[in-house]
């Protein structure tokens, strides 16, 4: 009996999600990213205070979870998808999931921004590894005309097109709710 090689392809895209700020909606923040052509780094949820861009290595089918209202505290269904190869060339790398005490022992202070806590021995375990997060120190310039905007609905897609007079500076706009048939 002969066996065939099976190649399981990893995802080709990384996704950065926007969220609402004090005065801007998640959609407004997405428009700002498209207008400026840059995802600005943030030190929110990052130890050591380093500003980073967070990206997620999610298969398209898993983007559906963004539509679940229970996830809205952490995610909103707005963002930018870019090619993983481009992000890698710009310096993005997968984070290191490990206990924080171990990171303090093993990593130089200037590298700890790469760590996301993995504390499985706790009574209530801390495990974010399902996010498959990547990080890039600083800001990330969008690849010219090759990013895809992610929005919740066709109404949001129309809003993107309206704000850019019919020509948003991206390869396309993907309405997640309609794509997945979620009411």
Question: Model-predicted segments: where are they?
Answer:
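NAD-dependent ADP-ribosyltransferases
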Residues: 1-183
């Amino acid at each position: 009996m002969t066996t065939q090689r099976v190649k399981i392809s990893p995802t080709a895209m990384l996704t950065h999600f926007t969220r609402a700020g004090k005065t801007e909606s998640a959609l407004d923040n997405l428009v700002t990213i498209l207008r400026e052509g840059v995802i600005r780094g943030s030190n929110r949820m990052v130890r050591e205070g380093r500003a980073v861009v967070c990206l997620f290595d999610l298969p398209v089918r898993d983007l559906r979870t963004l539509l679940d209202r229970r996830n809205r505290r952490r995610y909103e269904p707005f963002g930018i998808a870019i090619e993983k190869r481009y992000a890698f060339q710009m310096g993005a790398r997968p984070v290191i999931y490990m206990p924080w005490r171990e990171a303090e022992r093993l990593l130089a202070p200037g590298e700890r921004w790469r760590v996301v806590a993995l504390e499985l021995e706790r009574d209530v375990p801390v495990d974010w590894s399902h996010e498959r997060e990547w990080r890039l120190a600083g800001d990330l310039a969008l690849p010219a005309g090759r990013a895809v905007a992610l929005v919740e609905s066709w109404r949001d897609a129309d809003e993107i097109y309206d704000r850019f007079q019919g020509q948003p500076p991206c390869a396309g706009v993907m309405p997640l709710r309609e794509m997945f048939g979620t009411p």
